[in-house]
Amino acid sequence: MFLLPKYDSFWLFLLIASLIPVSAFSISKILAPVSQGPEKLTSYESGIEPMGDAWIQFQIRYYMFALVFVIFDVETVFLYPWAMSFKELGISAFIEALIFVLILIIGLIYAWRKGALEWS
């Protein structure tokens, strides 16, 4: 019941997906000309001269939505391998995943009741 060989294609995909951006940045770093100056340090606004300060402070409600999104996005990452090997793992893995999802639902209800998801 060793499930690691079933994920050979996943590991190959992960390796390729990691190497492509690393190689792109490496090639860019090697081939691109290096020039520093005041023009490089200014903010760029679609070809228009920048007006005002480029730093904008976001409201806290954006961070709360982002945090809840990340939590449930990570949940999907954990549930996907479980769903792929559901038949081999049996009822004990189903109960463990159910407990995991219930804990996340309880966290969502808590955030909802505390008003973390309220926009106004």
From Swiss-Prot:
EC number, UniProt record: 7.1.1.-
HAMAP family membership: NDH1_NuoA
Subunit details: NDH is composed of at least 16 different subunits, 5 of which are encoded in the nucleus.
Catalytic activity: a plastoquinone + NADH + (n+1) H(+)(in) = a plastoquinol + NAD(+) + n H(+)(out); a plastoquinone + NADPH + (n+1) H(+)(in) = a plastoquinol + NADP(+) + n H(+)(out)
Keywords: Chloroplast, Membrane, NAD, NADP, Plastid, Plastoquinone, Quinone, Thylakoid, Translocase, Transmembrane, Transmembrane helix, Transport
Name of protein: NAD(P)H-quinone oxidoreductase subunit 3, chloroplastic
Membrane-topology descriptor: Multi-pass membrane protein
Uppermost EC category: translocase
Residue stretches in coiled coil: none
Entry similarity comment: Belongs to the complex I subunit 3 family.
Organism: Angiopteris evecta (Mule's foot fern)
Annotated localization: Plastid, Chloroplast thylakoid membrane
Record's keyword annotation contains Transport: yes
A GO molecular function held by the record: NADH dehydrogenase (ubiquinone) activity
InterPro entries: NAD(P)H_OxRDtase_bac/plastid, NADH_UbQ/plastoQ_OxRdtase_su3, NDAH_ubi_oxred_su3_sf
Listed Pfam families: Oxidored_q4
GO annotations of cellular component type: chloroplast thylakoid membrane; NADH dehydrogenase complex
Transmembrane region(s): 10-30, 64-84, 89-109
Keyword Membrane among UniProt keywords: yes
Annotated function: NDH shuttles electrons from NAD(P)H:plastoquinone, via FMN and iron-sulfur (Fe-S) centers, to quinones in the photosynthetic chain and possibly in a chloroplast respiratory chain. The immediate electron acceptor for the enzyme in this species is believed to be plastoquinone. Couples the redox reaction to proton translocation, and thus conserves the redox energy in a proton gradient.
GO terms (BP aspect): photosynthesis, light reaction
